[in-house]
Structure formats: C-alpha cells, structure tokens
Regions:
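Contiguous, glycine/small-aliphatic-enriched amphipathic segments in soluble metabolic enzymes
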Residues: 1-137, 182-264, 268-283, 288-291, ...
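Active-site glycine-rich loop that binds ribose-phosphate moieties when present
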Residues: 140-148, 170-194
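Ligand-binding beta-strand-loop-alpha-helix segment within the catalytic cores
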Residues: 59-64, 154-183
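Short, well-ordered, mixed-charge alpha-helical segments that flank or form enzyme active sites
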Residues: 125-129, 149-151, 160-163, 170-172, ...
Length: 359
C-alpha cells in the first residue's frame, strides 16, 4: 500500500472497491489493517477483506475474491495525524515491498507466490531517513531480482516512454549517459511493446541537447552516445529512429506516429506523459523476471487522509499488471534481451557495465 502516511492506502481501497477490478485477480495487500480501515471510512467505500498477521503463515485460496490483508499493525504505533516523511513510514513501506518481492519470487507451485506486484507510492525521503540506500522502488526491485538490465517506463493511453536515466540531478545526466544506458530502454521497451501485441514497435529516441545537438553545435552526446545505441538496436531488427529534438518528438508520438519514445532524463519523459495521461499513466519496470507496476503519482502528503485522492492511476496499474501477468502465464520465458557485446549487437563492455545502475 506504499507509505502509510501518504495517499497509497486510500487509492488501494478505492480501486479495490470497484467490483470490475476485484474480479480481475485475487489480491494480497501488504499494509496496516487499521490504516486501510481508516482510509475506507474517509473515502466512504465499502470493501470487505480477510486479515492475517504479516508474520503468520498463510495460503491464498484461489477461489476467494475478497482481498487478503497482510497486517503489519503489530510493528508499532503510527501517528497518522501529521502526514509527511517519517522514519517509521520508510521502515514500513520498505517492509511491505520487500515481502511482496519475496512472494513474487517464490516457486511457481508455491501457494504464496504472486503473479505480479503493484506498488503504492513511497516517500524517497522517508526511505532515506530510515537509512536505506535505495532511491526508490525500481532500484530495489532490480537488486532483489538480480536484474542487471532494467528501465523505468511509463505507459498511458496516448504515450509510452522509457527512460535512459531516472533519479539523477540534471547536471549529472551527460556524465553518466552511455551507449548502454541508451540501448537498454530501446531494447527493453521494444520487448514491452511486443508484450502488448505491437508486433513491430516504432521507436523514437530523443536527443539530450536542444535541437538534438544541431550537428554538434550544442553538444556531442547525440553523435557520440545516442546515435551508436540506435544503430546497435537497428542491427538486430529494432525499428529505432532518431535522435529527435525532445520538444517536438512527443507531438508526433501523441498523434500515433511512434509506439514508444526513449527519453534521456526524467523530466524530459515524464512531463509529456503526465500532461497527456494524468490519472491514467502507469509506471512499469521493464527487464525484471517478475511483473511490477505502480501508479504514476507520489505520496501526495498534502492531501493524504482527506479522501480526495483519485484512484484512476492505481486502477490502470492493476489492469496492466493483470494483463502482463496473463501474458507471462502463456509464455514463462522472462525477458532475456541481447545486451551490448553479445552476438548480433555491437558495443563496448564498459558501456554495458555502466548501465547496470539504471533506474
């Protein structure tokens, strides 16, 4: 349910109060029972669930459509009267997701195994206060699943965007951008689009600099880093194109000319996604052996506990997770795209290694 002091509990109960959502899957909520009860009361939604202590053994009955709440209330008292970043909120929200990852990684015949994980919003500041080195969910999932190649991606009705870099100061982007960091989201995003039924995805790659560098006048990253990554992808049959100026490529993508845009940094990709797909966009971590999605918003401490949060993005995240999990059930092979340095793909090992810490 994400940070217990944010809007995560509210959007969870609102989403699961929808009978159409509840019929899609059997749900296990990792959270605090008292927090969920309070959220349901404030939002005035009716939702029944089973509760078990998080520390107890449990097995989910596949025929039961009521959610199962793994209750962490025994972990300690939580002051919900003042929403905001806290050490305890960080400890709890990390415990929720750590246990969910453990259950998603269980053997296929284990009754506790999850087919997908949909994460509620966490506070990166709370995680930092609690002493965790991970800046967010994406990095933790990659570490726990031993996924060397992964990318943060956003899917909305009008745009799909994958990021070459994510949670970095803007001044650092040009220093960490490598051929591998640009190649990975092209390759992984291509596979994701194919999972959605797009046989031959058309991919546009953004430049880093104004006017995509204007032939080196405003920077050399386009020719030195981005174009070689595009060429490597094209050599294995990926329809990758660019680099294009970031201020115009999203217009064409929103009009349907591109199935995926690869952005070089966080705000370059997320501003158009949220502008055009607010309340419907979903964050997906591509490249993992498990399915992980999340709503595209944060904890919104400023409106937490007021019953005002929209559950639209959480519903969309659940719907996409169910779709991806169903697809994987018919094809148990997890993503194993070719990285730079493997047969059929040109590149240097240094660039590939540098991409291991991508978001």
């Amino acid at each position: 349910m994400g940070d217990p002091l944010g809007i995560g509990p509210e959007v969870v109960v609102k989403a699961l109060a929808d009978p159409a959502i509840r019929r899609m899957a059997n749900f296990v909520i990792y959270g605090r029972n008292e927090t969920l009860l309070a959220a349901a009361d404030r939002a005035r939604v009716g939702l029944d669930w089973f509760r078990v202590d998080a520390a107890s053994e449990r097995a989910q009955d596949g025929s039961v459509l009521q959610p199962l709440v793994l209750d962490y209330t025994s972990e300690g008292l939580l002051d919900a009267s003042r929403p905001g970043p806290t050490r305890f909120g960080g400890l709890l929200s990390k415990a929720f997701v750590e246990d969910a990852i453990t259950d998603a990684m269980r053997a296929p015949n284990d009754p506790r195994r999850l087919d997908a994980v949909v994460t509620g919003p966490i506070s990166k500041e709370s995680w930092s206060i609690a002493g965790f080195k991970w800046p967010g969910h994406t990095e933790l999932f990659a570490f726990r699943t031993k996924s060397k190649r992964h990318s943060m991606m956003f899917s909305s009705p009008r745009l799909r965007v994958a990021l070459a870099t994510a949670h970095l100061p803007l001044m650092d982007v040009r220093n960490v951008l490598t051929i591998g960091k640009v190649y990975d989201p092209i390759d992984l995003g291509h596979q994701f689009c194919q999972q959605l039924g797009i046989a031959k995805p058309r991919i546009a790659v953004c430049g880093l600099n104004p006017h995509a560098g204007e032939h080196g006048m405003f920077g050399d990253e386009e020719g030195r880093v981005i174009r070689p990554a595009i060429e490597a992808a094209r050599r294995i049959g990926i329809d990758a194109n660019g680099p294009f100026p970031g201020d115009t490529v999203f217009i064409a993508a929103a009009a349907g000319e591109w199935d995926l845009v690869v952005a070089m940094y966080h705000d370059q990709g997320l501003i158009p996604v949220k502008l055009l797909g607010w309340d419907k966009a979903v964050n997906v971590t591509v490249g993992l052996p498990i399915v992980r999605t999340s709503p595209d918003h944060g904890t919104a401490f400023d409106i937490a506990g007021q019953g005002r949060a929209s559950e639209g993005s959480m519903k969309a995240a659940i719907e996409l997770a169910v779709r991806l999990a169903a697809q994987r059930r018919t094809d148990w092979s997890s993503p194993h795209p070719r990285g730079l340095g493997q047969p059929g793909v040109a590149g240097d090992a240094g660039a590939m290694a540098a991409s291991d810490d991508d978001d």
